[in-house]
Design a protein with these regions (language model features):
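Phosphate-binding beta-alpha-beta segment of Rossmann-like dinucleotide-binding domains, i.e.
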Residues: 2-50, 62-65, 70
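Phosphate-coordination loops involved in phosphoryl transfer and adenosine-cofactor binding
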Residues: 47-50, 72, 123, 132
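Glycine-rich Rossmann-fold phosphate-binding loop(s) that bind the pyrophosphate
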Residues: 56-57
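Rossmann-like adenosine-cofactor binding region
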Residues: 82-176
Length: 224
């Protein structure tokens, strides 16, 4: 494998989606291009907000490190596999899932899709969220029940969503998500930067060189 990789890239993208949602950057960009000005859309600052991360692995920790300078009131996390003491070491308070949904202004997903996590973002969890909250998904599409999220966005029961991963890819221009102004959509490329691709190729090549020269590969899967 070439892992760990793309932690910086995906966490950068999560932060970019947060800012895009809070400041309505795509909406304002389109408006200016169409000749509009003084576009009416309430924007919000990051300072004083509560960030909730679901899944506190490498990418989430990279994001937590990056947001430390934005003045968040608190960063909380739900991860059943990481102790409260471990999270406290990086300045994060461990909470239960329901509390995270209730108190967070921004919820960022950083976990694998499996039988336990698929459909985690659903009618019940969306109902717990603040009407000013935003959801960020740079992980996996199946974590979200699309119809439930669409209903919440259409009804303005949450402020916005920033989605890089989707249940159906490519998403397609006819997707209901494309009809909404309170969604920022990208094409499952959170991992893709010039530096990230170079790192991927370098690590993969290093594994080959290690084997050919009789060494244990530097990035074996069972060492993750």
């Amino acid at each position: 494998t070439a892992l760990p990789i793309c932690m910086e890239d995906v966490s950068d993208h999560a932060l970019a989606l947060m800012l895009s949602c809070l400041r309505h950057i795509p909406l304002r960009d389109r408006g200016v291009r169409e000749g509009k000005w003084n576009i009416q859309a309430d924007s919000f600052r990051l300072k004083g907000k509560t960030l909730g991360v679901i899944g506190a692995g490498r990418i989430a920790r990279a994001l937590i490190r990056k947001v430390s300078g934005f003045g968040f009131a608190e960063v909380v996390a739900y991860d059943p596999y990481i102790s409260a003491e471990q999270l406290a070491e990086i300045g994060v308070r461990k909470v239960e899932k329901e509390e995270l949904f209730r108190i967070s202004d921004i919820i960022s997903l950083h976990l694998h899709a499996n039988a336990e996590t698929n459909g985690m973002i659903c009618k019940e969890t969306l109902a717990l969220m603040k009407p000013t909250a935003i959801l960020i998904n740079v992980s996996r599409g199946p974590l979200v029940k699309d119809e439930d999220l669409l209903d919440a966005l259409r009804g303005h029961r949450i402020l916005a969503a920033g989605l890089d991963t989707h249940n159906h890819e490519p998403l397609g221009a006819q997707s209901p998500f494309c009809q909404l102004d309170n969604v920022v959509l990208t094409d499952h490329t959170a991992y893709s930067t010039a530096e990230g691709v170079t790192e991927l190729k370098t690590k993969a090549a290093q594994n080959v060189v290690d084997v050919l020269e009789g060494r244990t590969p530097r990035y074996p899967v069972n060492h993750l």
